[in-house]
């Protein structure tokens, strides 16, 4: 998909299913890829008996990574200028996750958006067009598990 400034308006929403029925195997695979073997994520006995959680749970960065993958698919490779957020609830094995990206501003001339470091035409200097997005990932019950913002370069 190619995002164009002329096709976007505030409030326009894009939705993407990230995962259905997240498995413990996927969580452990992420632990291996990231090197984060915290037993809260990988050891059921530790998570339940020692830490008092109902189960192991996914790494926050796994959730952000899946959200970022969908975001990059939406805005196109090489177009993401900034992406950040916070983890608002745990993600459990068996969860279904859906990301929603909502346009909050379109800057046809580079506008006030741009990268978090002020780059990518962030001062309305006639740079590339950008779009600002509110990012929200929820589980199957509608509970928000990640909330953030992103800015991407787009076509005029």
Tell me what each language-model feature is.
Residues 19, 68, 150-151:
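Residue-level structural signal for beta-strand termini and adjacent loop
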Residues 48-104:
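Hydrophobic beta-strand-centered segment that forms part of the acyl-chain substrate-binding groove
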């Amino acid at each position: 998909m190619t995002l164009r400034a002329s096709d976007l308006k505030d409030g326009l929403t894009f939705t993407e299913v990230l995962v259905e029925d997240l498995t413990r195997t996927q969580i452990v695979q992420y632990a291996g890829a990231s090197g984060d073997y915290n037993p809260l994520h990988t050891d059921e006995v530790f998570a339940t008996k020692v830490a008092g959680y109902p189960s192991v749970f996914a790494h926050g960065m796994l959730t952000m990574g899946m959200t970022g993958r969908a975001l990059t698919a939406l805005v196109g490779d090489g177009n993401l200028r900034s992406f950040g957020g916070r983890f608002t609830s745990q993600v459990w094995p068996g969860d279904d996750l859906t990301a929603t990206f909502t346009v909050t501003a379109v800057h046809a001339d580079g506008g006030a958006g741009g990268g978090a470091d002020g780059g990518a035409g962030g001062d309305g200097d006639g740079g590339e067009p950008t779009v600002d997005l509110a990012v929200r990932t929820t589980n199957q019950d509608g509970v928000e598990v990640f909330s953030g913002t992103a800015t991407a370069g787009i076509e005029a």
